[in-house]
Amino acid sequence: MSVAKIADAYAEALLELANSNKSLKETTNDMNIVSQFLANSSDLKKFLGNPLITRERKKNVLKDVLGEQISSVSLNFLMLLVNRGRVAFLDKIAQKFLELSYKQDAIEIAKVTSSVALSAQQQKELAGKLKLITGAKKIKLALRVEPKLIGGFTVEIGSKLIDTSIRGQLKKISNLLGA
């Protein structure tokens, strides 16, 4: 089974659970925390994906790291993923859940990667411009800092990519010159 299908299945199941428990907002917030945590900690991602580490150890680390920050329902979901050997896909599952949750509320997710952290004002202006471009009622920014971009940022909304980074511009110039 492909990673996308696995992520879809678990994300849909969690969405159904959150809707039936009337805890969609809380679960969405929890998955946002999980997603941001994984985006900022490549060590945790590697740890969870390592098949040599026992399930018990993975559970203990997840409880220690996220136990105080997320609801018991979300934590139990993470434990289920560990038990079923699917915790390596947690990042994709959380992203898919957020997409489904936001789509249900007519919110577009924009994955923004910038060379430096964006200020609150920059985030607000970017969200406003993306709202105009997409026609969405609301834009949710998923922020990530990637110094390799040199300058500027990239925005990914659905299958569209807007690349204003210096690295992207240098790549275009390189392709034009045939280097």
Swiss-Prot record:
It is a peripheral membrane protein. Pfam families: OSCP. The keyword Thylakoid applies. GO terms for molecular function: proton-transporting ATP synthase activity, rotational mechanism. InterPro entries: ATP_synth_OSCP/delta_N_sf, ATPase_OSCP/d_CS, ATPase_OSCP/dsu. Gene3D superfamilies: N-terminal domain of the delta subunit of the F1F0-ATP synthase. One of its GO terms (cellular component) is proton-transporting ATP synthase complex. It is found in: Plastid, Chloroplast thylakoid membrane. The keyword Ribonucleoprotein does not apply. HAMAP family: ATP_synth_delta_bact (MF_01416). PANTHER family: ATP SYNTHASE DELTA CHAIN. F(1)F(0) ATP synthase produces ATP from ADP in the presence of a proton or sodium gradient. F-type ATPases consist of two structural domains, F(1) containing the extramembraneous catalytic core and F(0) containing the membrane proton channel, linked together by a central stalk and a peripheral stalk. During catalysis, ATP synthesis in the catalytic domain of F(1) is coupled via a rotary mechanism of the central stalk subunits to proton translocation. F-type ATPases have 2 components, F(1) - the catalytic core - and F(0) - the membrane proton channel. F(1) has five subunits: alpha(3), beta(3), gamma(1), delta(1), epsilon(1). CF(0) has four main subunits: a(1), b(1), b'(1) and c(10-14). The alpha and beta chains form an alternating ring which encloses part of the gamma chain. F(1) is attached to F(0) by a central stalk formed by the gamma and epsilon chains, while a peripheral stalk is formed by the delta, b and b' chains. Belongs to the ATPase delta chain family. This is ATP synthase subunit delta, chloroplastic. It comes from Ochrosphaera neapolitana. The lineage of its organism: Eukaryota, Haptista, Haptophyta, Prymnesiophyceae, Coccolithales. The gene is atpD.
